[in-house]
Design a protein with these regions (language model features):
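Amphipathic alpha-helical interface surfaces
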Residues: 6, 23-26, 43, 59, ...
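Enriched for short, Lys/Arg-rich terminal
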Residues: 57-100
Length: 100
């Protein structure tokens, strides 16, 4: 998949040697996947509520790597929800515990 970052600060954090090994592995998993559906590890799941339209994978404890689709045209199912199996471009928007 094509992976971008919401801002330079987030990109630099993800690419730094001080970032966790699990974060780097999850990013590598995203890049190696053809679509969101191909992600196997990290308990991948679509989000709800104020994060509707975003997807997350687990890192450490309650921390998550959160991303959203950026395909030129966001693929949708008949019910209007995002068809994550067809999402091939994502933007990393948040890393941390969104449960707070």
């Amino acid at each position: 998949m094509k992976v971008t970052f919401k801002n330079v600060k987030l990109r630099k954090f993800c690419e730094s040697k001080s970032s966790s090994k699990k974060l780097r592995v999850r990013l590598a998993d995203l890049i190696a996947s053809e679509s969101v559906q191909d992600i196997v590890y990290g308990k991948p799941h679509p989000l709800k509520g104020d994060r509707l339209g975003q997807f997350a994978v687990s890192l450490e404890g309650a921390e998550r790597l959160v991303f959203e689709p950026i395909n030129a045209q966001i693929p949708r199912k008949e019910d209007g929800s995002i068809d994550w199996a067809k999402v091939t471009e994502v933007c990393i928007v948040f890393i941390g515990d969104y449960h707070d």
